[in-house]
Amino acid sequence: MSQEILDQVRRRRTFAIISHPDAGKTTLTEKLLLFSGAIQSAGTVKGKKTGKFATSDWMDIEKQRGISVASSVMQFDYKDHTVNLLDTPGHQDFSEDTYRVLTAVDSALMVIDAAKGVEAQTIKLLNVCRLRDTPIVTFMNKYDREVRDSLELLDEVEDILQIRCAPVTWPIGMGKNFKGVYHILNDEIYLFEAGGERLPHEFDIIKGINNPELEQRFPLEIQQLRDEIELVQAASNEFNLDEFLAGELTPVFFGSAINNFGIQEILNSLIDWAPAPKPRDATMRMVGPDEPKFSGFIFKIQANMDPKHRDRIAFLRVCSGKFERGMKMKHLRINREIAASSVVTFMSHDRELAEEAYAGDIIGIPNHGNIQIGDSFSEGEQLAFTGIPFFAPELFRSVRIKNPLKIKQLQKGLQQLGEEGAVQVFKPMSGADLILGAVGVLQFEVVTSRLANEYGVEAVFDSASIWSARWVSCDDKKKLAEFEKANAGNLAIDAGGNLAYLAPNRVNLGLTQERWPDIVFHETREHSVKL
């Protein structure tokens, strides 16, 4: 292990922001970039009249709807650390892509709209984080508006999300009467002022909760604050770093992202407390981040990031060693060596050629159709990183096209979108129509829009009489062949070449499983493993 690699790994922080739609996640992403100096002016999210859109929302459909459909990656430096921020789709229909992004991070920042509390998507995403004991920092947003009682919010997080809360800051008032926050650990009060788009100035700080200046500044609120703090300190958990790193306790911050207030404290907590890159599981062994040899896995493929170029980028999380431009690395699934000369790093949709990268960094590899989600790369060692699943889709549509002459473009478009993970594509063993599977309706809208804009294909989706899909496998090849022959009408091949059973209803699936006890029906499948 070289000292250089060890030092670089210690400097890295890789995290994702998770939230329910409209909790303020994209705004917070912008402000984190603003505070770090990565951008000079924040784009206003959903600024339809101004024509200005958020740096991290770049696909046409996102611009129309003001939601983060694709996950962007942004790298910036802050306080002698390199931060990799992964923006996840906030819309509830995009849980599968979001899940895959969460396999590539070491910690997460959970944003909660303090007027609404814990919402459905937040619950789903936190459950995904819990599978890997990911440390979570919590930000209660929108205190410049009327919000719910802060103690109630903490109780709700603990009850519903089953994670203990340790408030680090505490709000003074809300809405028009929002005065600032008290930093419990530092015994300091940060005074609120509405912040604009430009780089924020320092907020005024008053030292000590018993400072006489507070009586002059806000005589009505100060006694209530002191009473609340006494109550919070008696009833809440103290911050404990080990419990945070184990994913058992979340530090909670309060503020207003749109006003740049509370952002600095979050950034500092991620630098000071969140873990550096951790070892990763592969099929053969655990891979340490400070090992000398380069390795990594693909967690996402994005088609056409630049509408001017019909390119696809495969997003790779570096797991160990040092990546250097021009180095030879092996694409292990197809056993092919590639020269990594045009690999890129990200600042949202701005791309720069990557000269070097270390564990925790995200790099983009141009993909001409050979790379799939879950693929592993190394300097030669046969590694297959695990923990990147596909989920059984819940909604299905069959696809037709208005212009039969464009069938090739349709097939190419769906193949690319299937590999990217935007939608799951199944080719039935009998019948000509392709079947699309998704976790939510919006995914079909995205596919319709992208087929039209990127491949020039007008597609029509019809409802398909399918209830669910299960990937099937069997060690006994003879039994599998019998199963295929008997159930040809319900079988399809997915974009990864795996056999799937498309069940018309729950009863049918149950009966089929009973009839064929030797066949294994899988609700998820690993990206890197062929069933």
Swiss-Prot record:
Protein name (Swiss-Prot/TrEMBL): Peptide chain release factor 3
UniProt keyword terms in alphabetical order: Cytoplasm, GTP-binding, Nucleotide-binding, Protein biosynthesis
Location, primary (coarse class): cytoplasm
tr-type G domain sequence ranges = 10-278
* Cellular localisation: Cytoplasm
User: What's the family?
Assistant: Belongs to the TRAFAC class translation factor GTPase superfamily. Classic translation factor GTPase family. PrfC subfamily.
Q: Which Pfam families match?
A: EF-G_D2, GTP_EFTU, RF3_C
Task: Kindly give the NCBIfam families that the UniProt entry links to this protein.
Answer: prfC, PRK00741.1, small_GTP
In terms of SUPFAM superfamilies, this protein maps to:
EF-G C-terminal domain-like, P-loop containing nucleoside triphosphate hydrolases, Translation proteins
Q: Name one GO biological process term.
A: regulation of translational termination
Cellular component aspect of the GO annotation? cytosol
Q: What does this protein do?
A: Increases the formation of ribosomal termination complexes and stimulates activities of RF-1 and RF-2. It binds guanine nucleotides and has strong preference for UGA stop codons. It may interact directly with the ribosome. The stimulation of RF-1 and RF-2 is significantly reduced by GTP and GDP, but not by GMP.
Superkingdom, according to UniProt?
Answer: Bacteria
Which annotated residues bind GTP?
19-26, 87-91, 141-144
- Entry keyword annotation includes Cytoplasm: yes
Q: Does the keyword Transmembrane helix apply?
A: no
GO MF terms, alphabetically ordered:
GTP binding; GTPase activity; translation release factor activity, codon nonspecific; translation release factor activity, codon specific
